[in-house]
Amino acid sequence: MPLTRGRFAEYSGQTVLSRVGKADAVNLEPSVDAWRLTHRCSEYHLIYGDNLQAIVIATVGSPSIHVLLESITQYARDLPVYISSNSLELWAEVRGRLKNNRVVFRPNTATNFGDAYNSIVSYAFQHGDYDSLIIANDDVVLSPDTIEKMKADYKYVGREFKVGFLGARSDYVLPAQNIRVAEQDDVFSALKWESELHIKMTDVIAPIFAAISKEAWETAQFPSTNWYSDNIICHDLCKAGYFHFVSRGYVHHAGSQTVGNDFKKCHEEPREWIKQHRPDMYEVFYGNT
């Protein structure tokens, strides 16, 4: 049972942007189904300004966060970082690594993914002057051009669409974002699939490293669950007229360092919450049981 229908289905999975050389971005007239981004990301960023103005992380102490912080130190040092955690040692490490005063620490008193991120993301939007920011899992690692590509992609699709999530590609994530999953008639060249050079529209984004605007965040937030929180927020945003996209930007994902790899347990945990609070979505995940 698809989570989105009608207006969304006709675009879902299509390539809407590709990078094929150099040109003047100002003169581009994108169409809905096949856009061509024929300029370098750095040039595009200078033309269309700034976005994705902070990184927000919630953690329960996964060792992977130390690797994430090192990659932020190397590739996103200038972005403010908001962290929800109960570790004072981690707070000291973050300030020491990034060596700036734009690190905000908040206690993490939540018992699930949804509530943890709702709290820290809402705090960042309320106390920071941000139009958009990046939600990050604590077990991902940035590449040198992750932020650059996502900034360019987010600004570009935002010219034509109400953007819900723009999610990074990864190696341990939903199929639409997964670099291990080739598109139909894909070509493997220069150590990657040709489709990785494209933005595409999709039904659901796993926001392991994903951009969202303040406007979209005020429209829908995560349910109080671990699993299926992504599906539900994406569904709610689609119903409100937003579209979700897969970026060309990439992050490595260690995978399930927080909720674990017992998939049957993860599937069953949110059953009663969804049945009680989101009965409209219950059948999507659990059928008639």
Model-found features: residue ranges?
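C-terminal catalytic/acceptor-binding lobe
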Residues: L3-T38, P223-T289
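Short, well-formed alpha-helical segments that are part of the catalytic scaffolds
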Residues: G61-Y75
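Acidic donor-binding segment of Leloir-type glycosyltransferases
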Residues: T73-R106
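Glycine-rich, basic loop-to-helix element that forms the pyrophosphate-binding segment
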Residues: N108-A124
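Short beta-strand-to-loop acidic/aromatic patch adjacent to the donor-nucleotide binding site
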Residues: Y130-V141
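Conserved donor-nucleotide/metal-binding helix-loop-beta segment in metal-dependent transferases, i.e.
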Residues: D145-F165
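Short beta-strand-to-loop element that shapes/binds the nucleotide-sugar donor at the catalytic cleft/hinge
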Residues: G164-V181
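A recurrent flexible, glycine/aromatic-enriched loop bordering the glycosyltransferase active site
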Residues: L191-I212
